[in-house]
Amino acid sequence: MKKEYSCKEIERFVQKHWEINDTFKVLEDSKKDKYYCVSMMPYPSGKLHMGHVRNYVLGDVIARYQRMLGKNVLHPIGWDAFGLPAETAAINNKISPEKWTISSIEYMKNQLKLLGCSYDWSREIITCDPKYYKWEQLLFTKLYNKNKAYKKKSIVNWCPKDKTVLANEQVIDNLCWRCSSNIEMKKIFQWFIKITDYADELLNDLNDLKLWPKKVKVMQRNWIGKSKGIDVLFHIKDTNEKILIYVSKLEIFMGITFIVISKEHKLIKFIENKLPSIAKLIKNYNNEKTLELNLRKKTKDGIFTSLFAIHPISKKILPIWISNFFFTNNDIYQSIAAIPAYNKNELDFAKKYNLPIRYVIKDYFEKIIDFKKYNNLKEGILFNSNIFNGLNLKNGYDRISKFLISNKIGKRSTHYKLRDWCISRQRYWGAPIPVLITKENKILVVSENELPVILPKAKNNNIIHSLNSYKDWIYVLNDNKLVKREVDTFDTFMESSWYLHRYTCTKYTKDILDPNATNYWFPVDQYIGGIEHATMHLLYLRFYHKILRDMNFVKCDEPVNRLLCQGMVLSDTFYYFSKSGNKIWTSPKNKNFERNKDNKIINAIDSLGNKLTHIGMSKMSKSKNNGVDPQGIINKYGSDTLRLFIMFAAPPELSLEWSDKGIIGANRFIKKLWKITYNYLNLKKNNNYVFYKKLKEQDNILLEKSFYVINKVTKDIDKNQTFNTAIAEIMKLTNHLNSYINKNEYNNISIIKKVLMIIIRLLYPFIPHVCFVLWNEINKNNDIDKTKWPKIKMPFIKNKKKNIVVQINGKLKTVISFDISCNEFLIKKCVIENNKIKNLLNKKKIKNIIYVKNKIINIVLDDK
């Protein structure tokens, strides 16, 4: 064994060994317990950043640990290769998206191998490969034939910069999730999948996900947004027309003061026919433009229709308005009954147009409740509510509901915020939708034997945003008739919604999936990824899994048993404005700056002299150009050092602020472990050791500490997933072993070996390269990749006792010996029941018992 630790030499040797021996390749084995561990697949964005490293090292640590438990572990990897990031990067680099994507994959794949990730590379998926998206297209045709997919004209979220539609889940605070552009609303033909058919199941099955973060489940519940209420018919004064409105907050029903309808409401036609002056106003009312402002507008625009609805209980007249402050894609419900006293947007509108505001709730102190207090209100009394005055909120809800139903004014109804999933995008770099359209606009799905429909090649690297321009690809013959291909492509979440299933059978060519493989591996035992995917990928994944179950490709109801949402890796983030006014994000490494007395960055400039604005720490991302390339760290310190730092720096679910300082400490620890092993081998080689049949006290202490650490680390990795505390315990044990070796004149070599082997096995999931070599040095020709996790064995360790001093009113009475495992309750119970103490107490009343852990019990008597 060499005296000095050489990370490059070690890691190169070990990685070659893994590759030559296909160490992590796995097949189904019914004789073994399976474990399916996977991290969310990356976009091939060019290079891995530290956020990637954290995600994939987390998964690798868990996979390696589970292998050591003797399980058959599937740990695959793939690439989410379609979509805007690759297309934008390709345009910027003036090459085709395909070439950019493949070159990025090769680079990032090499980085993952350098990290030492234990993937089964034979199962690698690239979603832009026709061999993958062929089955996605087939699945879509099956959904269409089952009436689960459809095309309709719909108002959609439109990103003017990326020139594509966004699903509701991809709009954050009315901004594009990718480029932060203001979202507009357009009405165009789009493809949808009926996720709403599964709304109840998606909601109810959240209760079965015991090992998912509570926050993710809350986010999905809120997104699905199930509510129960009443569909109420409002008659329009002096007409035969009616408006159907869904009302969920029945306790404040008497506070309705006006009605709002959208421009899409069927009543608009009636207005245009009967009220030409209003029709002209409607025509000039650019709904598409104003809708983009939606709820972000401080003031809401509207048109009074000159019509009035009649409140079904109070018979008061309610003016009907057309407005932009609410939006729905629901064809039936295009109206709301406004209760401005208890809704901020409706209140703003009412104030602007001088509409009535009717408060209907007081608290028990006769104080009127407004919208600020209403949402968190638990108790209140109705007033201004006619026959319902004096009722509390619950009774008011029940009585008003009963009145509406019994008088046939309304009927019970269940609503969801969830809308069908818009899956079509107006971009080039995506999987083609396998549909043909005839001259008569009839839709034909492409037959299975003609799949995949392959994306046309970009000509001369000239990227055209839409497939509309590829005329030679669009027009084809079908039954000797000229038809047109669908020019939209799939949303990339279509690819990522089922890749976990395809990992189980990547070489299977008979159908979408091999049920034998999916039913062996599913559900996924551990899934790792960011919480930002809670209402997008994770919801679509659950939905697709249920579709695949209903097609008999898999049996279980949920795809993922345990979910770990790792925290973000943050780094300093800078930008400047170009001459054209565009915000340009610049890399943290290409800048100079100063720090003020509060340690805040000031006077930052880049290498070109641009004055930079520092926005603090933010998530590493390609879009903000603040990612740190791990390659420099790996080149200098090795991937084991990087892995150890990433796992030790913070609990996995919390954000980690990146700095290079912790790297040095992690590297120092690995060198210490190397030195301890080197010294042990020298002790053995020079015969400077003894074997003791009888263990000395320091031996017992070291062994007892070792078995405590095994137990603690096992719980931290397996149950708690607090990997940082697991590493901390191993470091303490390593320091203890080092002290044992340095302080003792005569070392028990068998104890050193035993503890050292425990440490190396405990560290193997975290720093596999150096542990592989150290293990092989201690146990010649023995492969740690096939070694079991250490078990607790303590038969040779005496049961330690703790002596507790017993006092009465502060005076020493006796000392009682207890087993070290006894807790406070047992100790107090035994002391009180001790015969000597019983006699001393002589039935006197005890006022208090004070316990100082593992030291003293003081019984305080009542003087009375």
UniProtKB/Swiss-Prot annotation:
Annotated PROSITE patterns = AA_TRNA_LIGASE_I
Task: Please give the positions of the paired cysteines in each disulfide bond.
Answer: none
GO CC term (a single one): cytosol
Is this entry keyworded ATP-binding? yes
Q: Does the keyword NAD apply?
A: no
At the top of the EC hierarchy, this enzyme's class is: ligase
What GO biological process terms does the UniProt entry carry, in alphabetical order? leucyl-tRNA aminoacylation
Q: What is its EC number?
A: 6.1.1.4
- Ranges in a coiled coil: none
Q: Which reaction does it catalyse?
A: tRNA(Leu) + L-leucine + ATP = L-leucyl-tRNA(Leu) + AMP + diphosphate
Kindly state the positions of the motif 'KMSKS' region in this protein.
619-623
Recorded protein name is Leucine--tRNA ligase
